[in-house]
Curated annotation (Swiss-Prot):
The record marks K326 as: RNA-binding 2. PANTHER family: TRANSCRIPTION TERMINATION FACTOR RHO (PTHR46425:SF1). The keyword Transcription applies. The gene is rho. Residues 48-123 form the Rho RNA-BD domain. It comes from Salmonella typhimurium (strain LT2 / SGSC1412 / ATCC 700720). It holds the Pfam family Rho_N. This is Transcription termination factor Rho. ATP binds at G169, R170, G171, Q172, R173, G174, K181, A182, G183, K184, T185, M186, R212. It comes from the Bacteria. Residues 61-66, 78-80, 108-110 are annotated as: RNA-binding 1.
Length: 419
């Protein structure tokens, strides 16, 4: 029996299962307590129980396996991992572990891990000789992540404009600069769907910090990947803990040569949370930002890299501007030069209800010649020369109308060549 499978089972089915095992009064209990009771009963009959989760090591040396369903929040059904197991398998925070567990004994509160079967979806022996993330060699992104799906839908238009304006590669550190109500969340959903469709081999994680609960639900239903969220009614310390868990998990997977993509909405809110949590240093920048507060969100964003030894970590984050808050401007200014791809959304275009509201002339990718063929690059540059003299709204309307006539960007370039 598997703890994770039970967590995904509806309560009504759990109650039926519990009653068939001879348990009583289940209808009045919380879901976690029902799972607890079922597993205890199951273990009494001498059968094995299995569980998995992402390890968080606490200051005392022991750790717990947290579940992604509860966005890595501490809960009663976490699995205890002893310090000896952590030392033996050289485990670190963020390792995804699955194995055999046992129910709590008298006086204990948590399930405990008995035997480690897998570390990061790999045998435990293989995890011992991996290179630490900090020692891997970072390179420029050189393998393209295509967004275009080629189905001719209106959603695909956004992906195609993105491919033309600022191509994305594996290991990109991208910043989507957006004023409020310019369609940044829709753009992220679009990117997530394109990645799931075109690149199923990549591990996709969507991290929503300080977002509205209904947007979290919408994202979970639309995206085929792991959606981890901390909504705006949660304290800043919770935002920070969730972000740290996600980035640590991503680093551990990159050490195992996986391609990981994190979509973060938004880095501004994350930086605000760090600003609240960090102890006051006494030096305060403009807008009330503590001088030490931006070090950790920069470390988060700076983790994105293409790795020479294999694997990559791509982070595409949104940054808010024009919110009327001086702090947001300062945070954006700090992050401005750090990314190697920038996509600017425009309030003016969005107000005219032209989507995607991308400011084509200001968007772009550094070293885009590594991601595209020489021929494609020439065509993209010619397109920029045509679009540059137009105003931002006219440019976007012109591009969308022309793209709508064709199904793929290759067809669009052919049409451009003929005309």
């Amino acid at each position: 029996m598997n703890l994770t499978e039970l967590k995904n089972t509806p309560v009504s089915e759990l109650i039926t299962l519990g009653e068939s095992m001879g348990l009583e009064n289940l209808a009045r209990m919380r879901k976690q307590d029902i799972i607890f009771a079922i597993l205890k009963q199951h273990a009494k009959s001498g059968e094995d129980i299995f569980g998995d989760g992402v390890l968080e090591i606490l200051q005392d040396g022991f750790g717990f396996l947290r579940s992604a369903d509860s966005s890595y929040l501490a809960g009663p059904d976490d699995i205890y991992v002893s310090p000896s197991q952590i030392r033996r398998f050289n485990l670190r925070t963020g390792d995804t572990i699955s194995g055999k567990i046992r129910p709590p004994k008298e006086g204990e509160r948590y399930f405990a891990l008995l035997k480690v079967n897998e570390v990061n979806y790999d045998k435990p022996e293989n995890a011992r000789n991996k290179i630490l993330f900090e020692n891997l060699t970072p390179l420029h992104a050189n393998s393209r992540l295509r967004m275009e799906r080629g189905n001719g839908s209106t959603e695909d238009l956004t992906a195609r404009v993105l491919d033309l304006a600022s191509p994305i590669g594996r290991g990109q550190r991208g910043l989507i600069v957006a004023p409020p109500k310019a369609g940044k969340t829709m753009l992220l959903q679009n990117i997530a769907q394109s990645i799931a469709y075109n690149h199923p081999d990549c591990v996709l994680m969507v991290l929503l910090i300080d977002e509205r609960p209904e947007e979290v639900t919408e994202m979970q239903r639309l995206v085929k990947g792991e959606v981890v969220a901390s909504t705006f009614d949660e304290p800043a310390s919770r935002h920070v803990q969730v972000a740290e868990m996600v980035i640590e998990k991503a680093k551990r997977l990159v050490e195992h040569k996986k391609d990981v993509i994190i979509l973060l909405d938004s880095i501004t809110r994350l930086a605000r949370a760090y600003n609240t949590v960090v102890p006051a240093s006494g030096k305060v920048l403009t807008g009330g930002v503590d001088a030490n507060a931006l070090h950790r969100p920069k470390r988060f964003f700076g983790a994105a890299r293409n790795v020479e030894e294999g694997g990559s970590l791509t982070i595409i984050a949104t940054a808010l501007i024009d919110t009327g808050s001086k702090m947001d401007e300062v945070i954006y200014e700090e992050f401005k030069g750090t990314g190697n791809m920038e996509l600017h959304l425009s309030r003016k275009i969005a107000e005219k209800r032209v989507f995607p509201a991308i400011d084509y002339n200001r968007s772009g990718t550094r070293k885009e010649e590594l991601l595209t063929t020489q021929e494609e690059l020439q065509k993209m540059w010619i397109l920029r020369k045509i679009i540059h003299p137009m105003g931002e709204i006219d440019a976007m309307e012109f591009l969308i109308n022309k793209l709508a006539m064709t199904k793929t960007n290759d067809d669009f370039f052919e049409m451009m060549k003929r005309s």
